[in-house]
């Protein structure tokens, strides 16, 4: 039963992740060039620097799109290879963060929780984007839940620094509490998640089901 609880907790949303990635791409895709380079290299050298950074951005975007396409096609090895290229050549950009998230996703699918945790920790600790760090922490909690480290999963899911993930964090905390057989606490966490969730969200049905499941078990004890 505990294993089923953990699997239930994992079903949070590769779709949500994909939507966030695509939203990020739409907003930032062609804007990752050095707009402050003039102050560094001077006006005379700016055109050469601009061409260099634009070429790097275009190259990174090509690899990024390739990685997404491979992932959608289920080509795990190729998606991982593309992610490794981004990590190696573009680590200092948000492409590197997204590549680590992809590596973690693929590793989790294969049950390689150690590598998934390593990739997520890189983003959580080193990303310059708070939203990326918050997402990585959230996913790291879920991977620890799957790996059976409920104490660490609980620690990661318990934070005030949730950014825009106001529903996701209490939901994952509820999943952890459910696996710990703390059913009334899980219900409270799921209720907080539901309160923060947009009324029309596609996640509402699953979240409500988990809340009702925790409540029914607690009532029968």
Model feature map: region roles:
Residues 2-38:
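N-terminal positive-inside, membrane-proximal cytosolic segments immediately preceding the first
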Residues 11, 15, 44-61:
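Aromatic-capped interface at the extracytoplasmic side
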Residues 15, 19-22, 61, 80, ...:
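Alpha-helical membrane and juxtamembrane elements of multi-pass inner-membrane transport
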Residues 32-35, 50, 74, 107, ...:
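Short Lys/Arg-rich amphipathic alpha-helical segments
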Residues 62-98:
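Short extracytoplasmic
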Residues 90, 96, 102-221:
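Soluble extracytoplasmic domains of inner/organellar membrane proteins
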């Amino acid at each position: 039963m505990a294993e089923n609880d953990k699997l239930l907790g994992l079903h949070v949303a590769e779709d949500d992740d994909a939507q966030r990635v695509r939203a990020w791409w739409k907003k930032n895709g062609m804007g990752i060039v050095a707009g402050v380079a003039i102050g560094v290299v001077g006006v005379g050298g700016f055109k050469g620097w601009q061409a260099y950074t634009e070429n790097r951005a275009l190259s990174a975007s090509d690899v990024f799109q390739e990685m997404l396409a491979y992932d959608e096609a289920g080509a795990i090895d190729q998606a991982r290879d593309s992610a490794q290229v981004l990590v190696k050549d573009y680590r200092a950009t948000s492409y590197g963060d997204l590549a680590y998230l992809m590596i973690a996703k693929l590793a989790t699918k294969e049950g390689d929780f150690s590598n998934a945790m390593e990739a997520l920790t890189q983003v959580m600790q080193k990303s310059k984007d708070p939203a990326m760090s918050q997402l990585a922490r959230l996913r790291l909690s879920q991977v620890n839940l799957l790996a059976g480290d409920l104490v660490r999963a609980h620690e990661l899911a318990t934070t005030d620094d949730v950014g825009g993930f106001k529903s996701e964090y209490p939901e994952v905390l509820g999943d952890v509490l459910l696996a710990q057989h703390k059913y009334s606490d899980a219900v409270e966490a799921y209720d907080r998640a539901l309160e923060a969730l947009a009324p029309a969200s596609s996640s509402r049905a699953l979240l409500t089901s988990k809340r009702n499941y925790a409540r029914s078990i607690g009532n029968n004890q």
